[in-house]
């Protein structure tokens, strides 16, 4: 097994599967990206996995149909960037149909876990994200629980996925990376 495989975005418009069972040894989860141009709509059916779609930048309007019912109906989210703005996220279970529309264009990350059954679809606005900021000075960072592990924030939304973000905070953000002290 090779641990040196590099997975790159192909800058494909629409849904792009980046890491999956088909191209990696990942047997429990996958990763993808959605790119939509201004005015573009994307619609697809989710099969064999649950998805957490996390908006990185831009705007999106979401619809999710599940078991013959429209559960998420035109919910809207927007985000300027990952450092300054809290995310908007969408949970989509297996066997659901998702439709996304972007007025100004969007980029989102898609986190997947392979399963045949999921929970109800859920639109998670920024005000329902738990954020913390541990550390001091250049070691300060922000964590954001989007869909948490059991006992944490939003732990009842997904079946298998745990989704969150970690970003650096000012003044360390100017470097856009986190560092640790060198060891001898």
Where are the language model's segments positioned?
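Conserved hydrophobic/aromatic beta-strand scaffold that supports enzyme active sites
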Residues: 31-35, 52, 89-91, 110, ...
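Short amphipathic beta-strand/extended segments with alternating polar/hydrophobic composition
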Residues: 45, 70-77, 123-124
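Hydrophobic, proline/glycine-rich low-complexity stretches
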Residues: 1-43, 50-63
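Glycine- and acidic-residue-biased ligand/ion/polar-headgroup-sensing regions
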Residues: 47-72, 165-184
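A generic structural signal for residues embedded in beta-strands
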Residues: 44, 62-63, 92, 100
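Ligand-binding loop in jelly-roll beta-barrel domains
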Residues: 76-118
